[in-house]
Design a protein with these regions (language model features):
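An aromatic- and glycine-enriched ligand-binding surface/loop that stacks and positions planar moieties
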Residues: 23-86, 166, 194, 198-205, ...
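Short coil/turn linking the two alpha-helices of tandem helical-hairpin repeats
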Residues: 156-157, 163, 212, 237-244, ...
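Conserved, well-structured interaction surfaces
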Residues: 47-51, 55-56, 83-159, 183-195, ...
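C-terminal substrate/ligand-recognition segments
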Residues: 353-427
Length: 514
């Protein structure tokens, strides 16, 4: 059962690097800045502050369903969206989306990162006797460091080079130099951003403890395994962006192995657990979760299911969740899309149980089949309308299957086919897919791992990032060498960000296209 308290806290609204004017630099002056001796005086207030950081990160990724635009639609694996805005991406690889400026704006990420950094600075100075124990103080510091790391990692995957802000922005005075000029923060090389994120992840690992499935905050707040999962992702992304950096590959192997051995999490056996196991995974806080965005009506952390294109349920669901078939927004399982073609032509996939668990009527009617990972809901008791439903599906960020397949990829990069295939087969076995018998060369293994990740994490906004990290673009017709040479796989920076901070340079591919 989901059991996290919902907190509200007025926090710094960081407009440095964002789109706000100087006059509204601080949307609301926070009590933590105005009266630090009053606010930072108890564990309860520190807990409230950390809850605010989680909330800011949640806002950054779910605003206008941006997490799907960044990590799912760009992957082009299973769902062909009927939505005209998504078609900018699917049709021509155009990331300059109509009515979706937020997808190019990193403002919300910096709000989350700056607040997390601020929390770290203040909690560090709080005496231990303000907390129940040193362990509790460390936990809160570790969770704040985790959010800061996760936020910068997301920005690195979306934009590549981004500014690093290593100070708590508490006053507009901090944005003015001694000479009276506005302080400008230029974009920093992607690998430096990853180093910064990795440093914060390691800090988090050192401060947090492992948790246990069934614990009240399991998977919806960070524990040591959450931070190790984040480190695994950062390290392998780093390796993929730095010519198979051997140190980073090994760090990814070590981090994934630690999660697998120590997290207490276990895989969902789709064959034996069936729909019950699938539902538990999607609703959240299941035995396989490592970190998730909490969606719960009981704790005022939900929203009504609506057939609109500004939320992830509207963009992924269809009848009978909706009262009638939606042919204007909902996606369909295009047989020509990479993942659907793979499932249809690979004989090993004939009895893959995920086709029936993950999708509604997969293979029966491609036009009306849809992903079911965001279909879980509860009735709005205040309404007599049977279709007045609150979402109850968590957004899964890290889970245990991810660790097995990341480790498989890391070993494939080292050309260690044995352990790579072993981890690949562990995931296949849970879905009634026979052991892998294909080629053992790196290229063959990387394709097999990408394919497994494509079906296992469909809808979880992984495939777009997987393509960049693995440099694998089969099935994406608008990707070419010339585009990639100019880093066209990254998203453009919103022009208003650049106009307010001239030291920010647009990504080469997008120059002249906005």
């Amino acid at each position: 059962m989901k059991q996290i308290k919902s907190f509200k806290i007025y926090i710094v609204v960081l407009c440095l690097l964002g789109s706000a004017s100087c006059s509204d630099l601080l949307d609301q002056e926070p009590i933590s800045i105005t009266h630090p001796d009053v606010f930072w005086d108890s564990q309860a207030n520190a807990e409230q502050a950390v809850a605010g950081a989680y909330s800011l990160f949640k806002e950054a990724i779910i605003t206008q369903s941006n997490f799907l635009y960044w990590g799912e639609w760009t992957g082009m694996t299973f769902m062909n969206s009927r939505n005209w805005i998504v078609n900018y991406i699917e049709g021509s690889g155009n990331y300059v989306l109509a009515y979706r400026d937020a997808s190019m704006n990193w403002k919300n990420f910096y709000r989350a990162a700056n607040w997390a950094y601020t929390i770290e600075q203040y909690i560090e100075d709080m005496p231990v006797d303000m907390f129940d124990s040193q362990t509790e103080k460390d936990r809160l510091l570790g969770e704040a460091a985790f959010i800061r790391s996760l936020t910068y990692f997301y920005m690195a995957r979306i934009w590549g080079d981004v500014p690093i802000v290593e100070q708590s922005i508490e006053s507009s005075d901090q944005l003015i130099s001694e000479d009276g000029y506005i302080v400008e923060n230029a974009r920093v090389d992607e690998l430096q951003v990853l180093d910064y994120a990795l440093e914060a992840a390691n800090k988090s690992i050192g401060l947090l403890q492992y948790s246990t499935p069934g614990a009240s905050n399991w998977a919806i707040t960070a524990n040591k395994a959450s931070a190790e999962a984040l480190k695994a992702h950062i390290s392998l992304w780093y390796a993929g962006r730095d010519n198979d950096n051997p140190e980073m590959i090994q760090q990814a192997i070590d981090a994934t192995t630690s999660v697998i051995n120590n997290s207490g999490a276990s895989l969902i056996d789709y064959v034996n657990e069936g729909k019950e196991g699938f539902d538990e995974m999607c609703i959240g806080q299941s035995k396989t979760g490592l970190f998730e965005i909490n969606i719960s009506a009981d704790m005022n952390e939900s929203f009504r299911l609506l057939q609109y294109d500004d939320n992830h349920t509207g963009l992924t669901l269809n009848y009978p969740v909706w009262q009638s078939v939606n042919t204007g927004i909902s996606p369909y399982m295009d047989p020509d899309f990479y993942g659907n073609e793979m499932m249809a032509t690979d004989a090993d996939r004939a009895n893959d149980v995920r086709k029936d668990l993950f999708f509604y009527e997969y293979g029966t009617n491609a036009d009306y089949s849809y992903l079911q990972k965001y279909s879980h809901s509860t009735q709005d008791e205040a309404s007599e309308d049977a279709y007045a439903q609150f979402s109850e599906s968590n957004i899964l960020i890290f889970r245990l299957a991810d660790m097995y397949l990341l480790r498989a990829e890391a070993n494939a990069r080292k050309e260690l086919s044995g352990p790579a295939i072993s981890d690949l087969n562990e995931i296949r076995s849970k879905a009634n897919v026979p052991d892998y018998t294909g080629g053992t060369d790196r290229e063959s293994l990387m394709k097999a791992i990408f394919d497994e990740r494509a079906i296992e994490f469909v809808g979880e906004a992984q495939s777009g990032y997987d393509r960049i990290r693995m440099d694998y673009y089969d099935g994406v017709p608008w990707v070419n060498q010339a585009r990639n040479a100019k880093k066209g796989y990254f998203w453009p920076v919103l022009p208003s960000v650049i106009s307010r901070n001239p030291s920010i340079l647009q990504t080469e591919y997008w120059r002249g296209k906005l």
